[in-house]
Amino acid sequence: MAKIAIMGFGTVGSGVLEVCRRNAASIARRAGEPVEVKYILDVRDFSGSPDAALFTKSIDTILNDPEIKVVVETIGGTKFAYPYVRRCLESGRSVCTSNKEMVATYGAELLALAKEHSAAFLFEASVGGGTPIITPMHQCLAANHISSIRGIVNGTTNFMLTKMKRENMGFDEALKIAQQLGYAETKDPGDDVDGRDACRKIAILASLACGHHVYPDNIPTRGIRDITVADIKAAEKLDSAIKLIAWYNEGGDGQMAAGVEPMLVSNSNQLAGVDDVFNAVLMKGDMLGDVVFYGKGAGKLPTASAVVADVIDALKEGVKVHDSLFWKPAEKPEGLLEDRNTYPWYLRVTGVAAALLPSVAGAGHVVFEDNGEAAYLVDAATSADIAAVTEKIEVLGGKVALDMKKLED
């Protein structure tokens, strides 16, 4: 029998215990032996729990038990999770995690440490929750060079944008509903609505795609706080939907760029029809072409099932998994990984008449003008062009309240 430990007994950690028990027979068949949770590390008091005997407040309990071969990390964050995971890997124990912040920040280091100590460091649940993305990418697509990734990887903001579109609802009201349903944090929803969650996820995918560590701090990131009902309606006029897109590009010259930002997505694009809490990631391989991964990006049991799948792989394959699941450390570059490509560009402007926008912003057309506010779609521009347009509008006494690229097919 394989004995494992869980560090952190929140939503996902408790889900891991539930999955291990409910699907014990199928897990044993796939792992080649029964899998049992022997310890749960959590500093809170669970003395009234039916599983009270499993709980410990000390990681040394886990590290001093030679029966523990795999440790599940679902603490979250990096303050405690990172040093605990390091100690587990240094002891030769494999670690399976759903912690996107830790993987995005320390992934290269922890992968190398695992390899050094003949262990596995697995993190399927860190990007797609219960939707498989990491394993297909480093195994099934291993013969492909991935040059482009576009994705909706945050279910909370996608739910909010869907609500805003379907029910003519503002940002604040959509956020309140997302919080009531448990999709967004009540105290600080910033990780979701400001794009930080999506940034960490695209950093992980970009690192896998290019083979070296991509730092989240180098990825330009914007959320959806500035999106209004007027923008939603303008998108519909333009046969598009507004989505928070996490993206990665590698150009022919080897230069890479990445970002997280709201975009106008043409209805002809597969991502435009991804609604509610669903996620989708579109990748372009040089041999396969386009491939799409689609499913719910979060949730207790979907995410826990992905973690347990990693546990099975760690028990069966161990260090062999790292033959393809690996990226190298890299020095942190200065500045941001800016996109230099040309796109149609949506501008919502205040304080400047719509009639002046063609001469200021270049060729394009007015989408709407109402109550001192106007929206204009520039036919083609780079981010540098838009920065220059923004300066011109400010000189005229106006302001660019929102700018978005338009993503075509």
Could you describe each region identified by the protein language model?
Residues 1-91:
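N-terminal glycine-/serine-/threonine-rich beta1-alpha1-beta2 phosphate-ribose binding loop
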Residues 311-409:
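A conserved regulatory-domain signal marking ACT and ACT-like small-molecule sensing domains
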